[in-house]
């Protein structure tokens, strides 16, 4: 069918993004507290009261916009990341680096670190997208890469308070945690939005938002 053919064409251009960063917890909140000399609790307090570095990971989505592996995603997906790995079409994994980021618009540009050629998608004219138009979202919700959902544009010019940029497309296509940074396609297979967030953290409630 039409949706299956369009999805098959677009899937190689959508990437899963995973990031890791080192998190250092707050230091001991009672730095001047001391146990009596020889107390059996002294060593235990030192062991458990000292902050321990740990690795934190996050998931997101993105899409390729040229054959050399330039990827567009949300800035909050990669912000603070020390290592970024992108998986293309659910198969090969590559390292990537940030080559541009803007916190105001919450957009980041990545470069996949390889000489391989990729299949890009192109941007459409989001200004022409109308309420009621069919759309497709492809992304990595909850780590389930290559997930495709569809719906319609429910509203335009929405404000959701995530950033100073307030002109979101609202859609009822399911968008969950991990979809952030992924593309919203029109029926021509052009990107008309970057899926950003959902209203409510427990899962999709029919209110997905996309930055045009």
Task: Label the predicted regions.
Residues 1-212:
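Serine-dependent protease modules
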């Amino acid at each position: 069918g039409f949706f299956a053919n369009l999805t098959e064409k677009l899937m190689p251009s959508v990437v899963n993004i995973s990031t890791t960063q080192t998190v250092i917890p707050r230091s001991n909140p009672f730095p001047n507290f001391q146990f009596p000399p020889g107390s059996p609790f002294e060593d235990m307090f030192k062991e458990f009261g000292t902050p321990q570095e740990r690795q934190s990971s996050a998931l997101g989505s993105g899409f390729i916009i040229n054959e050399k592996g330039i990827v567009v995603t949300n800035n909050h997906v990669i912000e603070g990341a020390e290592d970024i790995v992108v998986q293309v079409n659910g198969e090969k994994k590559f390292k990537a680096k940030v080559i541009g980021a803007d916190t105001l618009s919450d957009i980041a540009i990545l470069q996949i670190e390889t000489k391989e050629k990729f299949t890009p998608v192109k941007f459409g004219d989001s200004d022409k997208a109308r309420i009621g138009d069919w759309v497709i979202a492809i992304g990595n919700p909850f780590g389930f890469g290559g997930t495709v959902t569809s719906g319609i544009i429910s509203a335009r010019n929405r404000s959701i308070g995530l950033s100073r940029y307030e002109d979101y497309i609202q859609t009822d296509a399911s968008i969950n945690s991990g979809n952030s940074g992924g593309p919203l396609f029109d029926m021509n297979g052009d990107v008309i939005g970057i899926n950003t967030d959902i209203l409510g953290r427990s899962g999709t409630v029919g209110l997905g938002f996309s930055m045009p």
